[in-house]
Amino acid sequence: MTISKTFCIYPWMHQMIDTNGAVKLCCVAEDPTLPNRFGDVKSEGQAMHVDQTSLSNAWNSEYMISVRERMVTGKQVMDCGQCYRKEREGQSSFRLRANKDWKEKVKQVEQYYKIFNDEYNTADQPTKNRMDMSKHYVEDLPEYLDIRFGNLCNLKCRMCTGIYSKKLGEELKEISNKDPEFKKIAQSSAEIYNFDWYDNEDFWQELEKYLPHVRLLYLTGGEPTLVEGNYTFLRGLIDKGYAKNISLVFNTNVTNFQQRFLDTVNHFDRVTFNLSIDGVGGVQEYIRYPSKWKAVQQNMSKLMDKINATNQDKTLEYLLKYDPQFLDIQTANQLLNTQTSKDNNASGTQFRLVFTPTVNVINVGSFDELVNWAYQFSEDNKSNKVNWDMEPIMLQGPQFQDMAWANKEYKKYALQKLKNIEPKAFELFTSLHPFVNKMKIALS
């Protein structure tokens, strides 16, 4: 089997629970609980929500079986429209990125269907009938979970909606109550959802089945450092001994770092902070209102201090295991050198700090300034425990903020400014060059 033009690896190894409890294909997919979204998918209109179905039942529901079948045969899935639109416009999509990031899993799926088809072609009809029923059933539970325990957030970003920001949701609800016309055009943005769906013992018992399989966990919000559900979940993983086998990824707006957050994530194998910083100075403050640029810079420095301090505490803890009466200066130095060598070889938690600006019509003209600031900060804060990168994201919505809507003069200006990016930034940020090339195409 050769993967089709609509194939995405996620339905074979990834499951997402949105802030309102909806079980979705991924973070940019449409919400399956919306009616009439599935075209000819078999489970049209069927709710996919943790209040109405278990995670494991959702994993191999009629909907998921149909999605896998369509993707394997090259048919489009209605809920994947954002990726198709990006690809039509010549931009990178989550589908393409997922297939690239998980290329080994893609090969495994290809191999599965090759073996299946070979066996199917030589089987008798009764066997074929049984095989037809199980062809797109995935027995293994997903190794990648994206869970969002509510929408608590301290910002009201320009591109966001109430489902991901409690403050913005409250503001939109207030506006819609005063203006019926606004409610008509922004119904989903102003709607109040149930964000306490995880306060349910059945859900936690169901999630327990997944934990031995999970290798990657993506948590955001809202702002993940504020969401209590994240702390509850992570502490449970630590107490049950799963943390050492799991890599964590967080999106954070860099406005709120707490010591307990660093203390918690330090138990996990690898931790990636996706730093949602969209510009320098006023650009950042305008897009991610009401953040303050000075505070963002200070918090970045605090984050580095806390990461380094955590590693120093580990080294001290390592030394204190030895009886002080037998620990002379020479022996202590030898032990420190040994532990430092281990740290340099990825002993303990490894941190990855990734600048993830959302590129849109507002900040595309100052993208070079953000890259150069990020490069300089990274250079000034080198650490053997931290890997730096920049992975910009093309805006997924709302469409009117897409840089494609910029006029010719502004596009020309933004294209010219890309030449100001520090050349060494492309060496440090290995993901930057392909993205800038795509930007140039989009702006031309």
Model-derived segments and spans:
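Core AdoMet radical
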Residues: D140-L152, I163-D199, P212-E228, K240-Q259, ...
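Conserved C-terminal portion of the radical SAM core fold
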Residues: H14-L25, V249, F268-N274, K294-S444
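Glycine-centered loop/turn positions within well-structured domains
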Residues: K24, L155, G282
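Detector for the c-type heme attachment site
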Residues: Y84-K86, C160-K166
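Distinct, well-ordered alpha-helical segments
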Residues: Y231-R235, Q258-V265, S366-L370
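Accessory C-terminal segments flanking Radical SAM cores
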Residues: M1-Y120, L141, P392-S444
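C-type cytochrome heme c attachment motif
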Residues: G81-Q82, L155-M159
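Non-catalytic membrane-proximal stalk/linker segments that position and tether the catalytic domains
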Residues: M78-D140, K173-F203, K209
